[in-house]
């Protein structure tokens, strides 16, 4: 079991599966449609407000297909966890599965990492590899990668939370000492 409480789920597509599941499980859910914001920074200000009001300690960006700005990153330093469908540092950004197939690699996978200002560059928390088969399509490879994302994400959340708690304890001890 994961030592965490879900304080808030934020989605950017109303009616998506995550929103429906949150409602079914009585988890607070907020829709922030990125199309309703003039800039990414304005969206990220709204995210910061929502997360602070909910008392969020760690943000898990699973299925959040938006690049975040320093507004969000600086408000939650080393507390944004992203899951990406490649073995970073290979195949950053969009269409990582397509990039892997185009490069004819034999192994691909997924990476859970902390978010930094440059896309898909933060410290790696966990990775899982999957073979790339000769007859793989983007859909078949993505399906195998996604099953590994589901496997490593809880573990990565636990590790990221532990790192954050340790850093908080060290900071508190320094301030008191």
Language-model features, listed with the residues they occupy:
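Donor/substrate-binding cores of folate-linked one-carbon enzymes
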Residues: 4, 12, 62-170
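Anion (oxyanion) recognition and catalysis
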Residues: 23, 52, 101
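Short, surface-exposed acidic-centric catalytic microdomains
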Residues: 1-46
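Helix-adjacent hinge/juxtasegments
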Residues: 30-32, 36-83, 88
